[in-house]
């Protein structure tokens, strides 16, 4: 399962770096870790956001890993706004599954979302 391999890669990053760094460091480390878990990915993927068929603009998602959208956070705890934001990105992207990974907590926080 792709999500299980993404989570395994994320756990390795968290185990190695621990909490306390900025998001970009976890993004870079995850980009280094994913290929070792046999995963193909794109980083900083732009998605179009539409309203009633009209394009409103674009948003950037942190990763798309084999059709799974992945958002990275580095906060003490995931807040409702983070969950809602990730769910909105997932709906806008058209992907079916998303992961919200928070590396800032003492233990890696993982939220799986479905569209």
Q: What do these predicted regions represent?
A:
Residues 1-17:
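Interdomain/boundary linker segments immediately adjacent to catalytic/signaling cores
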Residues 1-2, 82-83, 97-115:
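Domain-level recognition of nuclease-like catalytic cores that cleave nucleotide substrates
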Residues 3-4, 19-23, 27, 31:
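Nuclease catalytic cores
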Residues 18, 41, 62-76, 89:
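Conserved catalytic cores of phosphodiester-cleaving nucleases, focusing on short active-site segments
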Residues 37-50:
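A short acidic/basic microdomain associated with nuclease active sites
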Residues 58-60:
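N-terminal, polar/charged subdomain of small-to-medium soluble alpha/beta proteins
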Residues 76-84:
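Active-site-adjacent loop/helix micro-motif of nuclease/hydrolase catalytic cores
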Residues 90-96:
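Arginine/glycine-rich "motif VI" loop of SF2 helicases in the C-terminal RecA-like domain
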């Amino acid at each position: 399962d792709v999500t299980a391999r993404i989570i395994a890669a994320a756990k390795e990053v968290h185990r190695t770096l621990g909490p306390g760094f900025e998001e970009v460091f976890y993004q870079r480390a995850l980009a280094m870790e994913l290929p070792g878990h046999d995963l193909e990915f794109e980083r900083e993927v732009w998605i179009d956001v539409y309203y009633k068929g009209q394009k409103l603009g674009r948003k950037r998602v942190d990763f798309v890993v084999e059709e799974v959208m992945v958002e990275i956070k580095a906060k003490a705890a995931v807040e409702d706004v983070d969950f809602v934001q990730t769910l909105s990105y997932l709906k806008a992207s058209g992907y079916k599954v998303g992961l919200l990974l928070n590396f800032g907590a003492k233990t890696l926080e993982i939220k799986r979302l479905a569209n």
